[in-house]
Amino acid sequence: MEEAAWIGSLAATGAGALVGAAASDAWQTARDGVVALFRRSGPRRAALVAAQLDTDAEMLAQTDPADRDQLRRQLLPAWRTRLADLLAEHADEVGADSAVAAELRTVTAAVLAELSAPQQTWVQRVHASAPGAIAQGVQGGGNIVNHYGEAAPTPASTDPAGR
């Protein structure tokens, strides 16, 4: 099943806030919020996520501040995937209005409120709606993620080269 555009967008925003918060004053808010989200899938999964968060935060804390952005780029795709999987697992028939989606939005907003401006650069907010809308974002230092809406009809090109 193809991932819904809202899942990719929300997971990317949440993951950006999470890795941006690591090794910062906003870390505890981010960690506690994400662990609470995964607790919905059971205590074992929440414990595994908590352990991974602690490992990632420790790695970032031990990394030279000049090299932290590179490590964050490496951590970002895994957290985006984990959050996307969680959102898809709990989307049910309500989709973007699920309790998990609402809670992730709340956690992300709380973390953003605590992050300094340089740390907020890790959070990318992309929203596109309407027929033919395209949302594109760069993650992990060069990975481009595209979400396409329903294509709008386009007039035929009059250029012989097809442009």
Question: Where does each model-flagged region fall?
Answer:
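Short hydrophobic alpha-helical membrane-entry/anchor segments
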Residues: G16-T29
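Pore-lining and gate-forming transmembrane alpha-helices of multi-pass membrane transport proteins
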Residues: G8-G16
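Short amphipathic alpha-helical segments that predominantly mediate membrane engagement
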Residues: M1-G8, R31-P131, N146-R163
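Residues at secondary-structure transition points
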Residues: A22, V138, N143, H147-Y148, ...
